[in-house]
A protein has these predicted regions:
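Membrane-proximal basic amphipathic "stem/tether" segments
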Residues: 239-326
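Catalytic core and acceptor-binding pocket of nucleotide-sugar-dependent glycosyltransferases
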Residues: 64-258
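Short acidic donor-binding/metal-coordinating loop in glycosyltransferase active sites
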Residues: 58-62
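Short aromatic/hydrophobic "clamp" motif used to bind/position activated sugar donors
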Residues: 55
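Active-site-proximal specificity loops/subdomain of glycosyltransferases
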Residues: 2-49
């Protein structure tokens, strides 16, 4: 409410009372806010106005280059026996549906259960209702500053400087499945386990289909990597990309399924991680929003150093293989 919509072209206008926003972190030239309550409220109010069998929830700044995503809606129909919730699987994006994440406080990558992309979702309206409508708005600022509260300061959040109880994507995913399955529980984002991750893996592949840009035709100008997810750099290793989704589908849903993709980044994760660092610097170099100074840094520092590190890792790997053969 109160937004100037005089220049917008729309069929139905949904105005909501603003639940407000909360500051996540502040830098010299930038402030980052948690707008999760705004997103959740507008999504729920939008679904109330939707009148057709199918619905699509998406960011207003996403660009649809085609309707290719519809070709996948009736694929991957098989399901496993556990955590079947939706009437039909929901389509969503690889960015940022996470398997694990790398943060500075942890030596190894950390699993992130129920972190499902909130960029866009397409499916039966009744299934999107199941996913969102009973999810409650959170109490702020306690939610966003959760790991700064006295009782939680000793906990290790997987999200680094961000101190929220859950990332928005994880809050939506976890809330939905926790209220529908009694054996799913997380106190906060630091409360994860291999057992819980196993439940999430089954829930995800039984209820969602994860697509990359080349399958969906949907991207976001704000993130140039959304046209080629490998340009997200080393975090690509931790995403539920289409290759990982196909493998999970074969494991949990249909062991006769023939995988159609091949991803060299996962055949050797260490080398894949190193190679993706090069991709990340190339992405920054080609990003139109990158300053000239930053482009020069990528060209003469970032790319050469990351490429050299990758070549060193390749040589180490090759030397190790030769020793084993001898």
């Amino acid at each position: 409410q109160g937004t100037d919509v005089s220049k917008l072209d729309y069929d139905t206008l949904v105005l909501c009372e603003d639940p407000g926003t909360t500051l996540i972190e502040e830098f010299t030239h930038k402030k980052t806010y948690n707008n999760m309550n705004r997103q959740l409220l507008t999504t729920k109010e939008g679904l109330k106005k939707a009148t057709r069998k199918y619905a699509m929830k998406l960011r207003s700044d996403l660009i649809l280059t085609s309707d290719n995503f519809l070709e996948y809606f009736d694929k991957f129909e098989a399901r496993g026996n556990n955590y079947n919730l939706f009437k039909h699987k929901i389509l969503t994006d690889v960015l940022f549906t996470r398997y694990n994440i790398k943060t500075g406080k942890f030596e190894n990558r950390v699993i992130i259960p129920f972190h499902i992309s909130d960029w866009w979702l397409f499916g039966l309206k009744e299934d999107l209702n199941t996913y969102f409508m009973d999810t409650e708005l959170v109490k702020e600022p306690e939610f966003t500053r959760y790991f700064n509260l006295e009782d939680n300061r000793e906990k290790l959040s997987p999200y680094g400087r961000a101190r929220f109880k859950f990332a928005p994507e994880q809050y939506f995913g976890y809330s939905c499945f926790a209220r529908n399955f009694d054996d799913i529980y997380m106190e906060d984002a630091a409360d994860y386990s291999e057992e819980l991750m196993e439940k999430f893996r089954q829930a995800l592949v039984n209820n969602f289909i994860i697509l990359e840009f080349k399958q969906s035709g949907i991207y976001l100008n704000k993130y140039p990597c959304s046209k080629n997810e490998k340009f997200s750099g080393d975090q690509y290793i931790g995403l539920y990309n289409f290759w990982r989704y196909e493998n999970e589908y074969k494991k949990y849903c249909d062991n006769t399924y023939e995988i159609t993709t091949k991803d060299s980044f996962f055949e050797n994760e260490k080398l894949g991680y190193s190679k993706l660092r090069v991709y990340k610097h190339i992405s920054k170099l080609t990003d139109s929003s990158t300053t000239c100074t930053a482009k020069l840094e990528q060209l003469f520092i970032g790319i050469p150093i990351s490429a050299m590190c990758y070549l060193i890792d390749v040589l180490k790997e090759q030397l190790g293989t030769n020793k084993e053969q001898k």
